[in-house]
């Protein structure tokens, strides 16, 4: 029986390994999983080496007989203090090891900065923490349990080292950047990849050595005889040599950490300088260099025979250095730096500006000054392509309308609405902007009686279909217009005569097909398909249309061995007793696309909301083939997931915010996930990023160059709004190149505010279709207006290009500083001051009706600026928004109508001749 119990963990591990292997194998990436396993086994073996050394040290220490008359012993209060210190250190080091273990299991890539992720923000609850303290205390006092405490700490140490394979791999694989930091001369790759590995290695070695030394001392001091006598047995000379040996190792490790702390100064904010300033360069760095030398000498003094006075002198010198850094640093800052701060800090401010611009790709911005004229009929004619695609539907109101008009059943959910573009009008040089929203299955919305095990895992397995709406059109009743709506055989595909778009073009460019969505944004439980039980596909009137999964994705569980492994993996014994599973059945797991791609590439940070694309002929020809593993059915729907590499240890780069410590960020990976089969491909969008190049070096079969991305998918690339927002945030202060202007702070920008739905919010970036200087064709752009700090007038805007070879390029349009250009908040005030508009708003916003002013857009049209704001009406009870009016302004006059062109006609009539 005992042997069976010992075999049980092995059975669980074997089952999990089999399911993971089969899951990776469906993508032909089993070699990636095997490499990760081998790395973890190798690291576990490496971690065993210091543990074996610690065990040998402990064995040597215990072999020496302790006496009460020979050697060094402690009595009275010194003994009591030593006993207390040992108890506290053993408790803290054991708790810290368990916290590191918890972090290594939950998110091992956070261990590179474990100090800010473990304490004080421990991931273990207070009750569990109390249980841990009680258990450790019991093991320390109960002689029979004491060896188990050491074994648990040692095993935890091995698991932590093994689980952090990503940190060690990045440190080994990252290539040199060939750019050095301006103060210490280290290659930038040291901070981006190697520092975390070195620091963690020293931390773990120090933690292990500390626990080993103090645990053995505690074993001696806490013996029943010692406590009874309130005196420790005497330590023999050999034991003292062993103690000095391990103490010297601790000093050498501390010297390494102090040396590395010199580099930490380069990515720590010091006043205005995002890194080491004059004070750190001329005082802190030398002091820490001397401290490193003293720690090394102290370690050598413990190993080599020398006089006691020398050791005391070295300890006193180290204490003096610590006092100097603690006390002299603020005095020097006050007496020396503050009186002539800019003169001393100019060089370091320049370093911070250049590093921050490089860290967030602000150095690639192309700047130009534009002096916009007043909007005129000529601008209206020249900017026709921009006006054709003005977004009058915000994502929020359209999503709410979708939920009320197109969810169709209680268990469907539209979780997001993404702006995209499709070439629907062959007579136009620009693509049609649309909002795409996927209809996913939300199992949490199933009625309670329907939440049976069979329903959740065998029948309700997938969502179905999506809606596509033009951003610039509405129905006569004010509700959204649709190119695609409905689902199943009742899916309606329509053109739009007002936009010059025919139904055939919509069918060609946005194919629907059998739009079953087995993978999506919403968290979904595992599904088993196909089985002998038919799956719910979509409703058709009062009838439910059923289907069977025909995709290539999933883990095969047709054999009994596979089914047993799946039951163990999911902790679901019912899989063993159901008669529904057949030889073709597969287990579909990790159906949330973000967790799906994260499981394969945990070293890439997948942020933001994925967005759905639907493209034609995705599998015809090698250049357009997305799902290379499936020949069962033609699939049109795919999810695009944005992946990032980031670092908080780039020298002199400023952190994004107090809550976001990133000092380096790249949108380096784009993952494409088949919404039906679940297949995944990873494309590298930043080939010059040293971090992603490290992972390419380690896993060459995982990544593909952007040139390998099918053209149909490449046409739907977008600069992620998350990444763009970070760039805008850093640009607000770091758009200047002159350290004097930066120091004075007289050219700081901010994101403007607007009133949306009665609340004051920051203006979010929005997509427009417009021409960029030097390109005669209109492009799909992401735009963010900017205003001076504490002033509402417009000062600049940042534009990200999304089309073709210009993808990712940034254009900064500066407006003349001597000219007043109204910002969004000022234009909204102008709108409310217009008597006709104000009167109409007052008539609407009363009783059961609620008026919602949408996002105010500032648009470059021709050589002028045009402000456009949609106005929605909704009842307070039902909340179905309808587009009531469109307000336009040229910055002086305001006009409003039900149609954009009619509103522009009114504006032109009001405007004096130019």
Swiss-Prot record:
Coiled coil: none
TM annotation in the entry: 4-24, 37-57, 81-101, 123-143, 152-172, 195-215, 240-260, 285-305, 312-332
Signal peptide from the UniProt entry: none
Membrane topology: Multi-pass membrane protein
Disulphide bonds in the chain: none
Compartmental location: Cell membrane
Keywords, ordered alphabetically: Cell membrane, Membrane, Transmembrane, Transmembrane helix
Recorded GO CC terms: extracellular region; plasma membrane
Matching Pfam families: UPF0182
InterPro entries: UPF0182
rRNA processing found in the keyword field: no
UniProt entry tagged with the keyword Metal-binding: no
Homology family: Belongs to the UPF0182 family.
Name recorded for this polypeptide: UPF0182 protein Syncc9605_1323
Upper lineage: Bacteria, Bacillati, Cyanobacteriota, Cyanophyceae, Synechococcales
């Amino acid at each position: 029986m005992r042997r069976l119990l010992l075999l049980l963990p092995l059975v669980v591990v074997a089952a999990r390994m089999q399911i993971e292997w089969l899951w990776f194998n469906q993508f032909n990436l089993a070699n990636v999983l095997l490499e990760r396993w081998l790395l973890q086994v190798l690291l576990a073996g490496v971690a065993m080496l210091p543990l074996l050394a610690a065990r040998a040290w402990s064995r040597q220490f215990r072999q020496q007989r302790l006496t009460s008359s020979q050697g060094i012993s402690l009595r009275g209060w010194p003994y009591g203090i030593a006993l207390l210190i040992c108890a506290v250190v053993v408790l803290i080091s054991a708790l810290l090891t368990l916290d590191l273990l918890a972090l290594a299991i939950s998110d091992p890539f956070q261990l590179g900065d474990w100090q800010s992720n473990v304490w004080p923000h421990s991931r273990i609850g207070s009750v569990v923490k109390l249980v841990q303290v009680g258990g450790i205390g019991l093991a320390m006092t109960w002689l029979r349990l004491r060896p188990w405490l050491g074994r648990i700490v040692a095993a935890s140490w091995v698991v932590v080292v093994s689980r952090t394979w990503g940190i060690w791999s990045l440190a080994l694989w990252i290539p040199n950047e060939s750019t050095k930091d301006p103060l210490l001369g280290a290659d930038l790759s040291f901070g981006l990849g190697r520092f975390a590995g070195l620091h963690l290695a020293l931390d773990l070695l120090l933690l292990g050595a500390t626990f080993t030394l103090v645990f053995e001392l505690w074993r001696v001091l806490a013996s029943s005889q010692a406590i009874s006598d309130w005196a420790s047995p005497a330590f023999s000379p050999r034991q003292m040599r062993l103690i000095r040996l391990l103490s010297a190792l601790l000093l050498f490790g501390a010297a390494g950490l102090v040396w590395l702390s010199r580099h930490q100064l380069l990515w720590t904010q010091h006043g205005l300088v995002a890194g080491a300033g004059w004070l750190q360069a001329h005082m802190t760095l030398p002091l820490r260099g001397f401290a490193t030398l003293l720690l090394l000498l102290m370690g050598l003094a413990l190993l080599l025979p020398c006089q006691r006075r020398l050791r005391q002198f070295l300890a006193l010198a180290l204490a003096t250095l610590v006092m100097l850094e603690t006390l002299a640093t603020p005095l020097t800052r006050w007496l020396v730096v503050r009186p002539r701060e800019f003169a001393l800090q100019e060089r370091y401010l320049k370093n911070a500006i250049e590093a921050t611009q490089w860290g967030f790709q602000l150095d690639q911005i192309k700047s130009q000054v534009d002096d916009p004229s007043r909007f005129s009929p000529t601008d209206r004619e020249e900017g026709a392509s921009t006006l054709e695609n003005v977004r009058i539907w915000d994502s929020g109101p359209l999503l709410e309308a979708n939920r009320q008009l197109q969810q169709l059943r209680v268990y469907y959910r539209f979780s997001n609405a993404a702006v995209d573009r499709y070439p629907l009008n062959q007579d136009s040089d620009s693509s049609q902007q649309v909002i795409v929203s996927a209809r996913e299955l939300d199992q949490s919305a199933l009625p309670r009686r329907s939440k049976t095990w069979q329903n959740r895992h065998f029948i309700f397995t997938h969502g179905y279909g999506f809606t596509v709406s033009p951003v610039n059109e509405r129905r006569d009743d004010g509700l959204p217009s649709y190119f695609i709506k409905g689902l199943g055989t009742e899916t309606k595909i329509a053109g739009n005569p007002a936009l010059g778009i025919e139904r055939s073009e919509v069918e060609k460019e946005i194919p629907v097909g059998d739009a079953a969505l087995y993978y999506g944004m919403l968290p979904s439980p595992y599904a088993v398909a196909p089985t002998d039980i038919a799956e719910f596909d979509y409703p058709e009137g009062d009838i439910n249309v059923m289907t069977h999964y025909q995709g290539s994705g999933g883990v095969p569980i047709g054999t009994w061995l596979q089914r047993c492994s799946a039951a163990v993996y999911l902790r679901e014994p019912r899989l063993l007793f159901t008669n529904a599973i057949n030889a073709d059945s597969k287990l579909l797991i990790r159906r949330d696309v973000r967790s799906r791609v994260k499981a394969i590439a945990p070293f890439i940070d997948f942020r933001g909301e994925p967005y759905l694309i639907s493209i034609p002929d995705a599998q015809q020809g090698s250049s357009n083939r997305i799902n290379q593993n499936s020949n069962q059915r033609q699939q049109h729907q795919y999810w695009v997931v944005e992946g990032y590499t980031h670092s908080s240890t780039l020298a002199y780069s400023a952190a994004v915010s107090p809550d976001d410590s990133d000092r380096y960020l790249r949108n380096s990976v784009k993952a494409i996930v088949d919404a039906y089969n679940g297949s995944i491909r990873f494309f590298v969008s930043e080939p010059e990023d040293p971090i992603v190049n490290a992972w390419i070096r380690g896993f060459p079969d995982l990544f593909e160059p952007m040139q390998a991305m099918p053209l149909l998918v490449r046409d739907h690339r977008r600069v992620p709004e998350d990444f763009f927002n970070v760039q805008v945030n850093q640009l607000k202060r770091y758009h200047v190149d002159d350290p004097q202007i930066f120091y004075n702070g007289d050219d700081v920008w901010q994101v403007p505010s607007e009133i949306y739905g009665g609340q004051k919010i920051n203006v979010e970036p929005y997509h427009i279709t417009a021409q960029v200087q030097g390109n005669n064709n209109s492009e799909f752009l992401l735009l963010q207006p900017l205003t001076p700090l504490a002033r509402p007038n417009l000062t600049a805007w940042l534009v990200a290009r999304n089309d073709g070879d210009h993808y990712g390029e940034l254009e900064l349009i500066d407006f003349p500083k001597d000219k007043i250009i109204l910002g969004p908040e000022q234009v909204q005030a102008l709108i409310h001051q217009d008597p006709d508009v104000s009167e109409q708003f007052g008539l609407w916003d009363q009783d059961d009706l609620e008026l919602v002013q949408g996002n105010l857009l500032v648009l470059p049209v021709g050589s002028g600026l045009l402000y456009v704001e949609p106005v929605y009406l909704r009842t307070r009870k039902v909340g179905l928004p309808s587009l009531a009016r469109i307000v336009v302004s040229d910055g002086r006059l305001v006009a409003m109508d039900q149609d954009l062109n009619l509103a522009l006609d009114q504006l032109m009539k009001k405007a004096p001749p130019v």
